[in-house]
Amino acid sequence: MKKTCVVSVFLVLLLLKFHDLSMGEEISPLKKVARREDNLVLSCAEFPCPEGYICDTASQKCRPGTD
């Protein structure tokens, strides 16, 4: 019984994944990384800002942008 439930849940998840792929809703690892970078908040005093970010002097936090 327990094995049947586990297999059923696995099959449902597998079907949902194929549905997402057919609808073009696949979330690639690159999209996940991009979303995390959007929320990147680093202190300029402690760390240099990564490429593509500048230090906001008022808040002392890195923000997307260029000089």
UniProtKB/Swiss-Prot annotation:
Residues 25-36 form a propeptide. Residues 1-24 form the signal peptide. Its main location: secreted. It is found in: Secreted. This is Kappa-scoloptoxin(04)-Ssd1b. Expressed by the venom gland. Belongs to the scoloptoxin-04 family. GO terms for cellular component: extracellular region. Keywords: Cleavage on pair of basic residues, Disulfide bond, Secreted, Signal, Toxin. Disulfide bonds join C44-C55, C49-C62. It comes from Scolopendra dehaani. One of its GO terms (molecular function) is toxin activity.
